[in-house]
Amino acid sequence: DAVLVKENDNKHTKCKISDTADSKRVYGVFADWDNDDDTVNDMYVTAVGTHVVRINKDVTVQAGDLLVSNGDGTAKVQDDDIIRSKTIGKVLTNIKQETYSDKSYTVPCALYCG
């Protein structure tokens, strides 16, 4: 006889905000915390599609720029125009959607990292 034990919420990959510049392990962009009342600390991650991406305060982007991790939870412009395993996505417009207290900001992007 076998016993099947279901582990709650064990289907999700564990993740963290990227702390490695140019990381090939980035698989999405933080969207929001799941604030339900369970005991699990879940977050929503946006992958393929369109979403805003947070850009480092010292980085200026243009529409068409490819983005990679800056290693501090924000993105920077990729060194070339070739979509790579480290590419997060492409900037759709440089119009800032939100600016944070640390002067980082978000812009709309097409995401490639899902």
Where would I find each of the regions flagged by the language model?
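Extracellular receptor-binding modules and their adjoining Ser/Thr/Gly/Asp/Asn-rich linkers
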Residues: 1-114
